[in-house]
Amino acid sequence: MLVMLSIGLISLLVAIPVFSYRITPNLFNRITSVVLIYSALLAFNGLHIESLASGVGIYSGLFHVTTVSVAIEGFLLFTGALILLGWGPVTEKTIARSSTTVVPTISEYSLMILFTSMGATLLLSSSDLVSMYLSIELQSFAVYILATLYRDSESATSAGLKYFLLGGLSSALILLGTALIYSYTGLTQFESIYTLVQVTGSDSAANSATYSGGVTCGLLLIGIGFLFKVAAAPLHNWAPDVYDGVPTIVTSWLTTMPKISIFVFLLELQSGLEGSFESLSLIFGDETSIDIWKNLLLIASVLSLIIGTVVGLSQYRIKRLLAYSTISHVGFLLLALAINTEESIESFLFYLIQYSLTNVNTFLILLAFGYIMSTSKSYLLENVNKQSVNSTDIQFIDQLKGQFKENPLLGLSLALCLFSMAGIPPLIGFFAKQMVLYSSTHGGYYFLSIIAILVSVISASYYLKIIRVIYFDSQDTQTDIVYTSASTHTVNSSDTPTITNVHSLLISSLTMIIVLFVLQPSILLNSCHILALSLFYY
């Protein structure tokens, strides 16, 4: 799988500067998506290796391949391919008619996607402090460049600069944590660190105190750095500005792919902490380090649930609203991760998978709305948002007024995605939240369960606000008058553009998964159950 990604990466590095004038950026994206799909198939094929159950160390122990890491690698690469396949804006007829209405495609986009995918897959299997830091930086640097690819857009460049500066701060925290752990233990491999601290903790209190403070503080710094990168509250302030400033096609990547790799890495780190750090105590208290780690995740979970829901109520820009929605979902993921039982890990994996698919489908639908609206009404959609160089982006919720009448299937698909995010039965999002809440109540976290239920009810209001705008609000006729008075070219009704067949197939397939999951839930649920058991019994 890594070999396939490396071959694709090297091929693009050579092809983009040599053939960029003869090969369109869309073709580069299609080639990259094929590489990602083939790599995902290779990853899934590796699940048949029996020795993966207990894990296999590769590259001198820098990476530790397990069943969970291989399965999530395949899912991550497959999800990345879905996002890339949604790039093709409209039909070739519209592209030939005018190039001003099409998203400005950039050949380097596919190259940055491969760099990010490479870093994410390496992070999933990292078992060493060095490989962990290099993997997260490979993923992060590519994402920083990805956020600023649209250098002619003031909002995109400012968002990318903010992302780079604050992301560098989180990387510095992670590096400081690794330095503390290495200075107190002299080791970089996670398994060796777990074993050393467990052995020294059983000798005497004096020997244990030598390692406890530094190692625990180092772990806390690493955890805070990763929570910063997944936009967990109260370290979330950068996320709404960045997600709203960059183009939608980039936002769809930022909100999904980096989070998958980081959350699964935290899952494997959590399993190691549970098994080997029970004897480690803080120098300023009697709580064990696993309790401190769990409290860190629980505090971030509660704050993410509350802030992501309450602040999202006042948003009128759709990508900022979805950013706060993402923060709220991060709270559910952290809650399931902190409980760390078989049931909670199963719910964690299931929630991560369903949220990724639902989130990707939501942004694919927003892209489709933007493509169709910008070409079917006028070439001056930037009048709605003059600061955006990307004229096909949906910036405001009000831009979706009356779209159910214009595009009923897209409107229905978006409504189903929003209902799933709100946790309305019988959609897939309901079962994900139900599993997290069941595991939290079964583990005795009743207060957190009540908070999660309340914020789920409250968050449904801003999802319903979008649905109300799509279904019941009428379009503003003054907008058409402004476009006409500007003497712009308006497309005739018989010349209305459509999205590509691949784009529509992706939307319909993901929507069917969201809706029809209830008819055959055992496929995904059994897979998550087996992955969760592999962490506890191997």
UniProtKB/Swiss-Prot annotation:
GO terms for biological process: ATP synthesis coupled electron transport. The keyword Translocase applies. It comes from Mycosarcoma maydis. NCBIfam families: NDH_I_N. InterPro entries: NADH-Q_OxRdtase_suN/2, ND/Mrp_TM. One of its GO terms (molecular function) is NADH dehydrogenase (ubiquinone) activity. The chain crosses the membrane at residues 1-21, 33-53, 70-90, 102-122, 129-149, 163-183, 215-235, 249-269, 296-316, 321-341, 348-368, 412-432, 447-467, 505-525. Core subunit of the mitochondrial membrane respiratory chain NADH dehydrogenase (Complex I) that is believed to belong to the minimal assembly required for catalysis. Complex I functions in the transfer of electrons from NADH to the respiratory chain. The immediate electron acceptor for the enzyme is believed to be ubiquinone. It is a multi-pass membrane protein. The keyword Mitochondrion applies. It is found in: Mitochondrion inner membrane. Disulfide bonds: none annotated. This is NADH-ubiquinone oxidoreductase chain 2. Keywords: Electron transport, Membrane, Mitochondrion, Mitochondrion inner membrane, NAD, Respiratory chain, Translocase, Transmembrane, Transmembrane helix, Transport, Ubiquinone. It catalyses: a ubiquinone + NADH + 5 H(+)(in) = a ubiquinol + NAD(+) + 4 H(+)(out). Pfam families: Proton_antipo_M. Belongs to the complex I subunit 2 family. Its EC number is 7.1.1.2. It is an enzyme of class 7 (translocase). Its main location: mitochondrion. One of its GO terms (cellular component) is mitochondrial inner membrane.
